[in-house]
C-alpha cells in the first residue's frame, strides 16, 4: 500500500549553488550531503513532506532544457508557499531568473496563485499558493 510521495531526483551543475537556491532562497532544509568516491556530490533536501534528491557530477552538468512540446517528461517542480508575492519579490531581489510573475492559477480548484522562476541550472520552478 502506498504511504506517500518520497522524493524526486535531479542533476545540477554545482551543489553549493543548488543548496543556496533551494535552502536559503526557497526554504528547503538540508537533510544529508555526501561526496562519492568519484568526486560527485549528492544531497537530500527536505521540502516538508517529500525530499528533493540532488546530484552534482564531479565534471559538472549542462544547463537543463525544457521538455519539448509533444514530448514526455517532467515540466516543472512545484513548491507550496503561504505568500508567493513575498517569495517572488525575495527571488527577484536575489537576481533569480524570472519566468512568470504571480497570477491567478488556471486550476483554481486546487491552487489560488502561481508564479514561475528558473533555478541556477535552468530548471523550471513553480511557486504555488492555495486559497485555504
Q: What is each of the regions a protein language model found here?
A:
Residues 1-4, 29-78, 89-118, 130-132:
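Vicinal oxygen chelate
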Residues 12-15, 36-38:
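Conserved beta-strand-loop-alpha-helix junction that forms the acyl-donor binding cleft
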